[in-house]
Amino acid sequence: MSTLCKPSLLFPHYKITQQQMIDHLEQLHDDHPRMALAKRMIQNTQVNERYLVLPIDELAVHTGFTHRSIVYEREARRMSSIAARQAIENAGLTTDDIRMVAVTSCTGFMMPSLTAHLINDLGLRTSTVQLPIAQLGCVAGAAAINRANDFASLSPDNHALIVSLEFSSLCYQPQDTKLHAFISAALFGDAVSACVMRADDKAPGFKIAKTGSYFLPDSEHYIKYDVKDSGFHFTLDKAVMNSIKDVAPMMEELNFETFNQHCAQNDFFIFHTGGRKILDELVLQLDLEPGRVAQSRDSLSEAGNIASVVVFDVLKRQFDSGPANGATGMLAAFGPGFTAEMAVGKWVA
């Protein structure tokens, strides 16, 4: 069984508090008839601060999709290489040991993929398998983990590097006055992670026992982008807030098949921080004590929703807290489709 090793996390230089974001929106849209409601909803997100790749005042002057794409590629190349090198070191491997590189990102576009840059910059083998994942949004991190697990199961030498990169601030549309645009502008943050999945049993971490996927039919409208001249415009249907009740039975089934116990009996959880409501629904539907998702809530509070990077941030927090050897756990994320990706396993100390 393959093992997820300790991730490397990087955050951009600029930081914004939620109060600063509220002040910014009030100044930009001082005559908006629903600003008071937007303010209350933003305060209810449980996000305290986020990191941005550019200062908010610079982002508020939309300089065009071309300029934002240049910033995206520049920072993607720079930050991904730093994170990747640290992750490979964390795993006790060298660049020559990597057989696959997966990259997840839904907040910008590059061709060739960032996987090509990483192969060149890190000096990976020319036979390295590439897996760029661009359209799974927040669930992409967990999807990459599950696909890397599939690859690692083929050979004990099939170590995989997973890089997740999200610059959601580059999708900020300052002139979009819809209520959900205000909320998303105050919810999503920027971050980069890298993590190695070792295909052998020679490292501590989250050893995956079984994975699962679930697609909710007729839910494409829940989470989507409208692609316009100004870039990506994020839209969110309120129905997504009630989606966990449909996914929870599949999570319970996967857990019971693997451990012969309910999710609530697990020792730890690595959950995507879709927002306060999603975490509340996970607690409710899986019959968990609220404190069981504290690390996901901490991630949301300290960095916002960092999309496909979230599961790696929460995984790193697990490493920092040090679960006992043999502790059982579940990793799960949710995103467009509506799609869920899950993995269950045990902690190797």
From Swiss-Prot:
CDD domains: CHS_like. Its EC number is 2.3.1.253. Pfam families: Chal_sti_synt_C, Chal_sti_synt_N. Pathway: Antibiotic biosynthesis. It catalyses: 3 malonyl-CoA + 3 H(+) = 1,3,5-trihydroxybenzene + 3 CO2 + 3 CoA. InterPro entries: Chalcone/stilbene_synt_C, Chalcone/stilbene_synt_N, Polyketide_synthase_type-III, Thiolase-like. One of its GO terms (biological process) is antibiotic biosynthetic process. The keyword Acyltransferase applies. Keywords: Acyltransferase, Antibiotic biosynthesis, Transferase. The keyword Transmembrane does not apply. It comes from the Bacteria. It is an enzyme of class 2 (transferase). Disruption phenotype: Mutant cannot produce monoacetylphloroglucinol (MAPG) or 2,4-DAPG. The active site is at 138. GO terms for molecular function: acyltransferase activity, transferring groups other than amino-acyl groups. Type III polyketide synthase that catalyzes the synthesis of phloroglucinol from three molecules of malonyl-CoA. Required for the synthesis of the polyketide antibiotic 2,4-diacetylphloroglucinol (2,4-DAPG). Belongs to the thiolase-like superfamily. Chalcone/stilbene synthases family. This is Phloroglucinol synthase. It comes from Pseudomonas fluorescens. The lineage of its organism: Bacteria, Pseudomonadati, Pseudomonadota, Gammaproteobacteria, Pseudomonadales.
